[in-house]
Every structure is written in C-alpha cells, then in structure tokens.
Amino acid sequence: IADAGQSIILIGDLPNELGGSYFLQTEFGKKEGTCPGVNLAEEKKVQDFLIKTIDSGHINAAHDISEGGLLVAITEMLFENPELGADLSIDSLGESNRLDALLFGESQGRVLLSVSNENLDKVLESAINDGLPVMKLGTSTDSGRLKLSVAGNEILDSEVNKLHKIWSESIPEKMNHS
C-alpha cells in the first residue's frame, strides 16, 4: 500500500477452516487437520479477475492471503511504509463463527487489494460481475497504526512498527525451535 486513503478490499470468502495452517503449527504445535479445500474453477475466476483488473490499472496493490491468513497479509502490505496504517472493519466472523479462523485461516482463492477511491466502484462492480465474493474492509491511513474491528468489537489497535518487529523476530525464533 503506497498511500493513505486507499480502499482495502477482500476478494473471496471469509475462511471457515484452520486445518494445516501456520497458526495451528506455530501456536499449538499441530501439523494436522483437514487442509483448506481447493476449487480450481473458483481460483481461475480469481486469477482472471486479477489479470484483467491489474491490466486496466485499477489496482494499486495486491497480496494473496496464504501463509498466516488475513491478519498477516494486511500487516505485510503495510510494512513497506511504517507511517501508513489501516482502519478495517469486518461485519461478522463468517461461516466458521471463529475469530481465529477469520484472522489466520488460509483458505484458497482470497486476495487483498488496495484501490483508489476513484476506481473503487469499478473494481467492486467487476468482481461482482465475475461472480466473486467481494467486500470493502476499510481504508489505509497515515496513522502508522493497524486498527481492526470484527462484528463491532475492536480486536486490534497497534503500531505497524511494533507488528513488524513481532513478525520479523518470530521467524528466527520459530526456526530455532523447529
């Protein structure tokens, strides 16, 4: 994300699974569980949408939601410029009704986008026309803080620099204990 005032959009559904996730492995030492399902037709729709929308110049940044899930993806998008932050809100926990699955689930076919307000309606309309689930999560800010509320409850309000430090130190820490 390059600037404050960008809309942050989720393409794809809210996750309903945690099996095989990095979260389960690092937090609970579990390397098992039913891995997220793969729907190749749905994945192709997402990839075709991304190619078309990037080619049109309507997307400023994109990040897949894979290892670590939604929360890791959004923080990684903010690391390039620690003066930026984001103010995000998700209306519900989704199908799983679990906060951990929402934040750390690694379901396939999901991407975060940063889009200018000028292109927001075009991107939303294009996703809907392509049959993709899409929701605006919030906007980038110049606060240097990541704020996230879920179902009306604030669950995170932290400095991006602090999140980056935790993220960067966790990799060597986990490697020393694997």
Per-region residue spans from a language model:
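Glycine-/charge-enriched secondary-structure boundary and capping motifs
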Residues: 32-33, 47, 53-178
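Mobile "lid/hinge" segments at catalytic clefts and subdomain interfaces of large enzymes
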Residues: 1-40, 51-54, 108, 116-119
